[in-house]
A protein has these predicted regions:
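HotDog/MaoC-like acyl-thioester-processing domains
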Residues: 3-7, 63-73, 79-150, 219, ...
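Hot-dog-fold acyl-thioester-processing enzymes
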Residues: 1-59, 111-214, 269-292
């Protein structure tokens, strides 16, 4: 049982969003650092890449427990929560280093891939033993508010984001890095909310915002520099203050779905930093947009 510190840093001014939270895309940049350090400790980082193999994260669950804001200092500790020949489960815990409070938990499913064919490879015995040496206790929350049946198609979904992958957004494998996906999903979320009246003007005037408390991110494919991107989004649930949203990102040239994000969040009172009931008129408009 051995946790490994995999990141230590701070939240910069340009990394906060319009509700004054550490922006989720920059969380994912930190998760990327933590994952790289953890895989390297297991011999599945550059050492594996030099041998024609690489590790890919296919599924990621994130729970946001406490806010991080500009100027906060943070660190991440990581470990293995499960391992077999099909791959690894990695767990990361994000702490506010100033007060020691656990802010975020992340669980990822990673698989070993052949760099040439991009097909899955089994984890060998030595690799599984290295993973077992890094096993940690984990209660990061496998039961999830984002674990719900998803619509089979996009009927009723809205077009919410469209652009092109830039060269500076790709990682060492030549694929779009996780923050590139999250930035687009964040833009898509803003367009979906505006569809029932939660526009930027509404949020400024009412001192309201949208705060995510849980993500489930999946990567069935990948994007590369120059690919055209399209995101379609659907509203799956509306409560008193809570909402559940599904985003699907596709390569606009081929139609291949490359990433999905199931997102749970709340209508937030920015002054009180607490969930606030949706106004009745917005809730009714939102209910008219429900899909699935």
């Amino acid at each position: 049982m051995s946790w490994l510190e995999t990141y230590r840093g701070t939240v910069y001014r340009w990394e906060v969003d319009n509700v004054d939270h550490f922006t989720v895309a920059y969380y994912f940049a930190r998760f990327e650092d933590a994952t790289a350090a953890m895989l390297d400790a297991l011999g599945l980082g550059r050492e594996a890449f030099a041998a024609g193999r690489f590790s890919a994260v296919l599924d990621c669950r994130v729970r946001y427990l406490k806010e991080l804001r500009v100027g906060d200092i943070l660190h991440i500790r990581s470990g293995v929560t499960g391992a077999d020949e099909t791959g690894l489960l990695l767990g990361h815990e994000v702490y506010n280093s100033g007060d020691g409070v656990l802010c975020t938990t992340v669980e990822q499913r990673a698989v070993l891939m052949d760099a040439g064919s991009r097909t899955p490879l089994p984890l060998g015995g030595a690799e599984r033993r290295a993973a077992d040496a890094r096993r940690v206790p984990w209660d990061g929350g496998r039961s999830s508010s984002t674990d719900h049946p998803e619509p089979a198609d996009d009927r009723g979904f809205l077009d919410t984001a469209r652009d092109t992958v830039k060269a500076w957004e790709v990682d060492t494998l030549g694929e779009a890095a996780p923050p590139a996906y999250i930035h687009r999903f964040s833009a898509a979320n803003a367009h979906l909310l505006a569809g029932f009246g939660m526009t930027p003007a509404y949020m400024r005037e009412r001192v309201r915002g949208f705060s995510t408390f849980e993500f489930r991110l999946r990567f069935p494919g990948a994007l590369r520099a120059g690919d055209l991107v399209r995101v379609r989004s659907g509203l799956l649930h509306v409560g008193n203050s809570s909402m559940r949203i599904l985003h699907r990102m596709a390569n606009a040239r081929t139609g291949e779905v490359v990433a999905t994000l199931a997102q749970s969040g709340v209508h937030l009172d920015l002054a009180a930093r607490r969930p606030a009931p949706l106004p009745d008129d917005l809730r009714e408009r939102a209910k008219g947009m429900l899909v699935g």
